[in-house]
Amino acid sequence: MREVRTIAAFCLLSFAPLCCLGQPVPPTHLSLPQEPTPNLGKLKTKLLAYHDCTAPTCYAPSLNHQADLAIAWLRHRVAQAKPGEKLALVLDIDETSLSNWDQEKADDFGYIGSDWDAWEAKKQAPAIGGTLRVFNEARSHGVAVFFITGRGEAQRTATADNLKAAGYKDWAGLALRGPHPKDESTTTYKSGERRKIVDAGYTIILNIGDQLSDLNGRPQAEYSVKLPNPFYLIP
């Protein structure tokens, strides 16, 4: 009996620190699978860090750098404008003009349609500072600004109100997506809206979006600027 108690006491004393501290005990032999795709949880942690950090390659500095490029081109092009030429700037909205970061975090980087509809209805999305700078620069030179968004037509009033509340005022047009064929791509829709602007007599000198599908297709702007967005993809 004494020997049994001694062994039990030895086991208790030997392993108690590990149990109490919650330290994992790694297996002596471990075979790991091949996982070419990074772990989703780790990627989400990296996205949070990328958004919040302040190094030159982080989210906010990258946004501002792209905005600076856009403003430089805008000033150059306005100076070269011909008499009577109608110049236009085209802007996407989500993650280009307005930030949905709070909602993205709330849904853990997923897309829940009802949540996004409720978020858009609140009209609380703040402006993306760099894009607002471009907008104000354009308006100061008399350049017309057109928004082309993938938001549905049902969100027109809420979207317009949110844009104005965020500081975007005195724009020329707001295009939202109505009923469309299921096979119509974002590029097809947005390039079609740009065609309407060109047909109205404007020269699109600058187009800014966070997705390549905001910029691809014809007619294209004379100069296009892609903003960073590793948070979601719209092909």
Model-derived features with residue positions:
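Stable alpha-helical elements in mature extracytoplasmic
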Residues: 59, 63-66, 70, 127-134, ...
